[in-house]
From Swiss-Prot:
<feature type="topological domain" description="Cytoplasmic">
    <location>
        <begin position="287"/>
        <end position="300"/>
    </location>
</feature>
<feature type="transmembrane region" description="Helical; Name=4">
    <location>
        <begin position="190"/>
        <end position="210"/>
    </location>
</feature>
<comment type="function">
    <text>Mediates the Na(+)- and Cl(-)-dependent uptake of imino acids such as L-proline, N-methyl-L-proline and pipecolate as well as N-methylated amino acids. Also transports glycine, regulates proline and glycine homeostasis in the brain playing a role in the modulation of NMDAR currents.</text>
</comment>
<protein>
    <recommendedName>
        <fullName>Sodium- and chloride-dependent transporter XTRP3</fullName>
    </recommendedName>
</protein>
<dbReference type="GO" id="GO:0015199">
    <property type="term" value="F:amino-acid betaine transmembrane transporter activity"/>
</dbReference>
<dbReference type="InterPro" id="IPR002438">
    <property type="entry name" value="Neutral_aa_SLC6"/>
</dbReference>
<feature type="topological domain" description="Extracellular">
    <location>
        <begin position="59"/>
        <end position="66"/>
    </location>
</feature>
<feature type="transmembrane region" description="Helical; Name=11">
    <location>
        <begin position="534"/>
        <end position="554"/>
    </location>
</feature>
<keyword id="KW-0813">Transport</keyword>
<dbReference type="GO" id="GO:0015816">
    <property type="term" value="P:glycine transport"/>
</dbReference>
<feature type="transmembrane region" description="Helical; Name=10">
    <location>
        <begin position="490"/>
        <end position="510"/>
    </location>
</feature>
<dbReference type="Pfam" id="PF00209">
    <property type="entry name" value="SNF"/>
</dbReference>
<feature type="glycosylation site" description="N-linked (GlcNAc...) asparagine">
    <location>
        <position position="155"/>
    </location>
</feature>
<dbReference type="GO" id="GO:0005886">
    <property type="term" value="C:plasma membrane"/>
</dbReference>
<feature type="compositionally biased region" description="Basic and acidic residues">
    <location>
        <begin position="16"/>
        <end position="26"/>
    </location>
</feature>
<dbReference type="GO" id="GO:0016324">
    <property type="term" value="C:apical plasma membrane"/>
</dbReference>
<dbReference type="GO" id="GO:0015838">
    <property type="term" value="P:amino-acid betaine transport"/>
</dbReference>
Amino acid sequence: MRLAIKRRASRGQRPGPDEKRARDMEKARPQWGNPLQFVFACISYAVGLGNVWRFPYLCQMYGGGSFLVPYLIMLIVEGMPLLYLELAVGQRMRQGSIGAWRTISPYLSGVGVASVVVSFFLSMYYNVINAWGFWYLFHSFQDPLPWSVCPLNSNRTGYDEECEKASSTQYFWYRKTLNISPSIQENGGVQWEPALCLTLAWLMVYLCILRGTESTGKVVYFTALMPYCVLIIYLVRGLTLHGATNGLMYMFTPKIEQLANPKAWINAATQIFFSLGLGFGSLIAFASYNEPSNDCQKHAVIVSVINSSTSIFASIVTFSIYGFKATFNYENCLNKVILLLTNSFDLEDGFLTASNLEEVKDYLASTYPNKYSEVFPHIRNCSLESELNTAVQGTGLAFIVYAEAIKNMEVSQLWSVLYFFMLLMLGMGSMLGNTAAILTPLTDSKVISSYLPKEAISGLVCLINCAVGMVFTMEAGNYWFDIFNDYAATLSLLLIVLVETIAVCYVYGLRRFESDLRAMTGRPLNWYWKAMWAFVSPLLIIGLFIFYLSDYILTGTLQYQAWDATQGQLVTKDYPPHALAVIGLLVASSTMCIPLVALGTFIRNRLKRGGSSPVA
């Protein structure tokens, strides 16, 4: 039986108490100061760290410019339609995720609960990135930058052994920032410096959300616009760097054969899906504060296009920096080889250059074979292509690769401050959406809001997240961060959004939803949106769900990358049983909300019917 939303009373008919309550709630609900605040809030939430550190990595992995083909196709068939769907649901129901899906059907309340659980998991670990951003920002004012050189050993007779085997940027990240343990089984204690940075990050979030849309609406102007200012500055600087063209040519040279690679399409769909923040409930929460007549279709298109354009723009910046770093390392490698051969064979200074290096190497190998064989093991194989092929994503790109490029720039402190300030703004903008996804359903709840004011609810949520997030500041914290980042949301969000599309199209009814949209926006629903919602997007999500589920099953024993201080590099290890249990709990705790809440609703309804039935 389809569960309908109660219609307004017809003329001459007195509205019932439920309808009066709904109207009072609609009137009392806070709203954005203007539509621009809503758009900026969505952009600030959607445009996040993934645009800067994951999309460039995918371009690098899957054929440079050719990756844009599946990416743009997935934007059209998946990104825009699903974004519009969530904005329309939030604006129509004018409630957070739990209330919105309960209005469509009481049996779907679990969809909103699952979104809140996933958003809670995300908030716990995501703000740790902002804590790291604060840590690097504070250290960016030092001259020289603390990650530019290796520290001396305890005897002050040479450089630290771990740093020499790795690099100064890796050492600062793994030892000075994380103080990482050798494995996930050695948790260590909470480290006070990262803990203070995490506390500061949560304090910033709390101040931004303290007054709801009143404060968030003003903050999003800054968190949305500031990253673009920094990216433009970095683009101008990046294009003037030596070797930037090498990186840009690498990015825009398409490898057409990658279009036949299924993983390129899978990753394009996944990037669109997670970059827009679908399924978390944040977009529904933001849209619930809109005017009912707001043109959410136009805003969905604007936000999705800006989000994807930012990914491409950030990639141009990243690859120009990447080209500079690769060229710097390549030329540094050549100089070391030239110096080695010049000293070993007593060559005249300036005789050996990069242009004649290979020719001279062949000559020396044929003329002095014995001596050359002694030197040969110390001659590095320098290749610009191999430097450009070194693919890094996530924290490795943000805190190691970028840091390494920045330390070699002139006025490196300035560029470091700008870069890590930009990361902070991107991270804070996303955190505003994550916390809105949690707070909106809680403040909508009459049970909770009748006992606690909004400020207290916000403070309690931030305090709990901050306390639990201290796990990520331990010596093994980065390993737990990777677990949450890899497993807390992937399958859960796919299932949530799949149920959302089915709920709107087949439970609430597509025709009925189309009628609601016509009443809100004054325009009919285009066939494109209906086809995407009813058929294409659900099938695509099912395909992604099957792929990730089979990938987890076929992978066998799950593994992680651990830092080996003795080798100065990452090594692969198997997850211990307790870590596997946490992974299973993360996936199950959110996905099981949907069937369990539906079952609980069914049982409660049956008990109510049984209790009200007359006794024979």
